């Protein structure tokens, strides 16, 4: 049996972390430039 709730939460957290990481990286890149 697959834990769909855990899988959904994990995917949501990973997607949010990736989106937040990209925005954070862009803000740093803009400060350097």
From Swiss-Prot:
Q: Which residues are listed as membrane-spanning? A: 5-25
Note the superkingdom of the native organism. Answer: Viruses
- Topologically, how does it sit relative to the membrane? Single-pass membrane protein
Provide this UniProt record's keywords sorted from A to Z: Host membrane, Membrane, Transmembrane, Transmembrane helix, Virion
Does the record's keyword annotation contain Transmembrane helix? yes
State the compartments where it is located. Virion; Host membrane
| GO cellular component, as recorded | host cell membrane; membrane; virion component
Q: What is its main location?
A: virion
Q: What does this protein do?
A: May initiate with G7P the virion concomitant assembly-budding process, by interacting with the packaging signal of the viral genome. The assembly-budding takes place at the host inner membrane. In turn, G7P and G9P are present at the end of the filamentous virion that emerges first from the bacterial host.
What does the sequence similarity comment in the record state about its family?
A: Belongs to the inovirus G9P protein family.
Spell out the protein name for this chain. Answer: Tail virion protein G9P
State the organism of origin: Enterobacteria phage I2-2 (Bacteriophage I2-2)
